[in-house]
Design a protein with these regions (language model features):
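Low-complexity, acidic Ser/Thr/Pro/Gly-rich terminal tails and inter-domain linkers that flank the onset
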Residues: 36-86, 148-171
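Short acidic/proline- and small/hydrophobic-mixed sequence motifs that coincide with surface turns
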Residues: 98-103, 182-187, 200-202
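Intrinsically disordered, low-complexity Pro/Gly/Ser/Thr-rich segments with frequent PxxP/GP/PP motifs
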Residues: 113-140, 201-230
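N-terminal Sec-pathway targeting helices
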Residues: 3-20
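Asparagine-centered strand-capping/turn motif at beta-strand->loop junctions
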Residues: 92-98, 176-182, 195
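Short, surface-exposed ligand- or partner-binding patches at beta-edge/loop junctions that are enriched
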Residues: 136-156, 227-241
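Hydrophobic beta-strand segments
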Residues: 104-108, 188-192
Length: 241
């Protein structure tokens, strides 16, 4: 499902004579606002910092809202490298809709270049910190000429963690999975997880691990999950068979 919203956003921000370029440029050099919550372990390991965070609250398709914009220093999560970077352009996006967003691209256009953000697996009521896909750095005073949400896709059916079948315990670098039914589960079990703290998800990326061949009744298996931590990871959904 794809839908562009650039023109609609511009009309919305022109109400009262306030142009989009002016309204969003203010977000890029205004006084710092309240930063999102940080995962405790990751904050200590990578000295995550949010700077010049300013509220935007710009509506996008399917209930998405561009919530904040600013600068991020810490682990770069979007390509799985966890490389420590400084002053990366970031946005936070909230899902005010009633369905989980499977994928969306957020494009923030300037006079000379476009910042690109991608999100996966954003449930209703959740917010996510997104880092610019090409590691674009934050520069105060940039003017924004357009904001789009493109290639927005919703899950055809709401995803499930299958809590009636599986118990999944995140650990540091591992996931422990137990079949809590009285029957064998045949076929692969694929577990999707994200980094999180409180109500904030971190990174557009959704990680996954596979339990090949399923689990026998009552069986527990531990599998390597390189980006997982006991305190800072959340199971988003699981597919069975």
């Amino acid at each position: 499902m794809s839908r562009k919203m650039k023109q609609k956003n511009m009309r919305w921000l022109l109400i009262g004579g306030t142009a989009l370029a002016v309204a969003v440029a203010l977000c890029l050099w205004a006084k710092p606002g309240q930063p999102p919550d940080l995962p405790a372990e990751e904050a200590q390991e990578s000295t995550i910092r949010f700077e010049e965070v300013q509220s935007a609250e710009i509506p996008l398709p399917h209930g998405l809202v561009l919530q904040d914009i600013g600068s991020y220093t810490g682990m770069y999560m979007e390509d799985g490298s966890n490389e420590i970077l400084s002053n990366i352009l970031m946005v936070t996006v909230r899902n005010d809709g009633d369905r989980t967003v499977q994928y969306a691209e957020i494009l923030v256009s300037g006079e000379e270049e476009t910042a690109r953000f991608a999100l996966t697996t954003l449930p209703p009521g959740q917010s996510v910190v997104l880092l610019e896909q090409n590691r674009m750095t934050y520069e105060g005073g940039r003017q924004v000429t357009g904001i789009e949400a493109d290639n927005v896709a919703l899950f055809p059916e709401e995803p499930s963690v299958h809590a009636d079948k599986l118990e999944v315990l995140p650990g540091n670098g591992v996931l422990k999975v137990t079949n809590i039914t009285g029957e064998d589960i045949s076929g692969d079990i694929v577990i999707y997880y994200k980094n999180a703290s409180s109500d904030m998800l971190y990174g557009g990326i959704t990680y996954r691990v596979t339990i090949a061949g399923g689990l026998k009744a009552g069986e527990t298996r531990q599998t390597v999950a390189g980006h997982c931590s006991a305190a800072g990871s959340r199971i988003m959904f699981i597919t069975v068979g």
